[in-house]
Amino acid sequence: MNTLKKNGEFQNIYNLGNKYFGNYSLIFFNKNKLEYSRFGFIASKKVGKAFCRNRIKRLFREYIRLNINKINDNYDIIIVAKKKFGENIEDLKYKDIEKDLNRVFKNSKII
């Protein structure tokens, strides 16, 4: 999995890309000129303490790892956790996040 690392890459996607909302997350995406997709994961301090933010990012990475073959190439994608995600982190299962992200990705036509 290729990740977005530079601040300029994130800013480019925020400013020029599209966004779609889910119950627990939102995605920003934009076409790139590469032969592969790149991903960025964000969980701000509004979501919760460090252990909560890290768990959220691990769940996002796991979703991408399992579904990378379904995702169209040539996209830069940022997945951002909503505050609601952090509030319910102890009650949420991977299946809930998977269902939410599947819906968001299908609506955005990335899958």
Swiss-Prot record:
A biological process term (GO) from this entry: tRNA 3'-end processing
GO MF annotation terms: 3'-tRNA processing endoribonuclease activity; ribonuclease P activity; tRNA binding
SUPFAM superfamilies documented for this protein: Ribosomal protein S5 domain 2-like
Catalytic EC class: hydrolase
A GO-annotated cellular component: ribonuclease P complex
The keyword Repeat belongs to this UniProt entry's keyword annotation: no
Task performed by this protein: RNaseP catalyzes the removal of the 5'-leader sequence from pre-tRNA to produce the mature 5'-terminus. It can also cleave other RNA substrates such as 4.5S RNA. The protein component plays an auxiliary but essential role in vivo by binding to the 5'-leader sequence and broadening the substrate specificity of the ribozyme.
Family annotation (HAMAP family): RNase_P (MF_00227)
Subunit record text: Consists of a catalytic RNA component (M1 or rnpB) and a protein subunit.
Family: Belongs to the RnpA family.
Protein name per Swiss-Prot or TrEMBL: Ribonuclease P protein component
The encoding gene: rnpA
